[in-house]
From Swiss-Prot:
Domain of life: Viruses
UniProt source species: Mycobacterium phage L5 (Mycobacteriophage L5)
Keywords, in A-Z order: DNA recombination, DNA-binding, Viral genome excision
Protein name, per record: Excisionase
Pfam families reported for this sequence: HTH_17
Entry-linked InterPro entries: DNA-bd_dom_put_sf, HTH_17, SinI_DNA-bd
Classification of source organism: Viruses, Duplodnaviria, Heunggongvirae, Uroviricota, Caudoviricetes
Gene: XIS
GO biological process: DNA recombination; provirus excision
Amino acid sequence: MPPRASIQETADYLGVSTKTVRNYIADGRLKAVRLGPRLIRVERESVEELMRPIGK
């Protein structure tokens, strides 16, 4: 996964829908940056953090 991935790339990586990724961003579970009016990129570190088991 690239350092900053598209919403579709992130959804494919996590095995969820793009709507779920957008909800994760809105809830603060994933960090994303807006690079233009329609261009959003998700930070790889936040994806790794989301996938890290609790208590580790």
